[in-house]
Amino acid sequence: MTYQTFFLISDPDNLDYPIYIVYDKSRVLDYFGDIFYTQSTTITEIELGDTNPDFKISILHNNNYLTSHVIKSTKYSLLDVNTVQMLLDYKDPDYELKSTCHLYIFYMTKNRFDICDYLIASNIKYIDSFGNISLLNSTNLNNYQLIKYIIDNNEFFNCRYYYLMLGILRYTKFYDLVDYILELISKSNNHIDYNSLLMELFSKFDCMGSLINSEIDAFQIKKLIDGNYFDEKVLFDTVICNNFELTKYLVEKGFNYDFDTIINSNVKFDVLKYFIELGNYLTDDHIYMILCNTSCEYYEKIIYLVDNNHITEKYFTKSIISRIIHFEFYLLDYLTNKLNIIELIDLDLLMKTSIRCNETVMVKKCIDYGINPDEYMEFAIKHDICIAKKLMELGGNIPDNMCIYNPDAYLTIESIDIILENNYDSLENLLPKIINNCDSEIIMYIIKKLTDTTIIIPHGLIKIFIRSYYWGRGNDIYSGIINSNLNFDDYQQIIIGIMRKEYNKIEQLIFSSTYYNSIELLFVVTLSENIELFKLLLEINCNDNNYLSWAFVFSIGCFKLMKYIVDNYNIDIYQRQFEVCIMSLQNYYRCYNQSDQIKFYLLLMGYEISCFNNKKNYNENIPLVKFMREMGVTLV
């Protein structure tokens, strides 16, 4: 391997302990995805620094490697055609490239179509394992010259005109390119299913399942409509369900339509209103169909139809009213004010639904309609003290065998206030349940309640604080903690002090406490990435091998901590390899900027790449998994 030629695409971020990814000269063309990702426009020829005593090398993929030392030689510009020819010359004639999509995309996005021509002339095929998805994504399609180049060279790229049209119509306003494709199709044997194209244009998701963040350009669709590219029925059925502007355009052009079809299609409110205002007559069947279909802007439709006297009491049934209670509860208040439908209402269903929704207005209406509030007090108490209290104010009486306060009911900010103001329970007793519910809004509220009190903070709340610290310092709970004035005990003061970055105070607290060997405290210190506190804990616990092994596992979140413990303590880095790999994956989501370097370092030290991302390792008996679950941290 000493005499092989390798290339370096970019320098590593951490130059204090650099780990280089180097590429076999004969395979660089296969790795233009990495070049495209880094946006590097140069490539450096290197020799491996295998004369260095600390030299290490490990295979990363088939033809690229990780190494700790390189000797840089010559830098080449990737925008120079001579460099491209050099890479072509290095390629083994018998080797078939696995992927060249990013090779071509790299040069097209740089507007170096001359180099693309050179690659085509050199018989470098366009290869994309995902078809043409990489080529026809929304970013590339914003480049007019790039799309034009693909169209002009489509015999080489072999893109279906269907997907070219779809991408251009979906993401651009390059109208002349649509006309250009239509002209090319007319001169060839190619055919586009324009009806399928139209339906796919209105899809909210692309072929990879990603949400499409673009609006349909009605102008270009109108041109295709005028050119009679669509079947009239497919066109009308598709448009009325998706685009009001195009719906009006079709009607104004004189398209024949069936009003029954429009009603059956459960169109949006603006479309329904438009056709009614055109003078189309709503039959009884139409109205029943609208009333029974409680989706697609139902609330707006029913209010409009009632306000304009298209719907009266005669159209409602008990079944329809019950559906409204279930699916459009807040519509019922409007309907009962406008129409005489009380006899159709299942008052028991309405009362229970009103209690579940904490809707005092509807509860009062039910009582006005004859409901006995006493019969629903037990139901209300089990649900929420707030609505139970309101029911009492409306004349309800608590059963002799019950108390208005139900300790098992779900807590809200309003219910907590009622409980505390009426001395139904104490904040100390409520805290464990609040902690278990782990509602961030309620916890923030409780932090304010606890401020400047003498109430001792339970350890469960500290675990929530640590969890908020773990997932990111920009969240509300973390911000609330560091700005609060709570009654913390000695251990909690250490934890909170770390979060507040009061490191000078913390050292003395650790020395004078019995918590110096706490694994939980060690975890928080590694989250802080403070090297001095980390050194202090290691120094105090230097003879505890179990503690040191935990320190190594937790340090995987921060390269400088990990490197320190490896360099200064006799750690067996392979003893807990599964746990280290689990921690590495967690940190991929927490601190992506460090995760690759840590992973590469471990690979250089002999870790198997198959160990990473292997969720079969998440055995509950593994100490790290058990610890994280006790902390309430969900493993990803």
UniProtKB/Swiss-Prot annotation:
- Keyword Metal-binding listed? The answer is no
Repeat among keywords: yes
Which keywords label this protein?
ANK repeat, Repeat
List the signal peptide residues: none
Instruction: Spell out the residue ranges that the record assigns to ANK repeats.
Output: 63-97, 99-129, 130-159, 161-190, 230-259, 261-284, 322-355, 372-400, 425-455, 517-546, 548-575
Identification of the protein by name: Putative ankyrin repeat protein L766
Source species, please? Acanthamoeba polyphaga mimivirus
